[in-house]
């Protein structure tokens, strides 16, 4: 797993790099610190943080890819990780309870909360209209961006089992905290 402790040192950076970080995205370095993951392929991070409205205003998908495809993959990665966790840790819970619990853990409201807790909204690249209409705090947009970020980590860390481990490293603490008393019985 590619984890790095992010330093607050700005030595060697120009004043523009202090705010934008090495990816050119405002807050990207802080975001990496918040999730405990440092991207090898910064283009994946950039794509994960790019809303379709920004892409449209900057030449479209071929020139400035947006996060929609990553969102698609991230949704599935998250579902598998949470499903495996519930299946392995709550062996006495019936399927219906596990399904209900997973639905609550990965619903728009929960994902928007996870996204807000890592400061994801502050890092998004939004088109002018989306920016003016409050897109940085819109739950549906935060949810989608969070799923895209998961996919970016998954792909950057090698996909497969390595990718799932990397994503689990920062997703599961939030999920476990939210899990609270949703399921009866104790986890194994």
Can you say where each PLM-predicted feature lies in the sequence?
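Double-stranded RNA-binding/processing signature
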Residues: 1-188
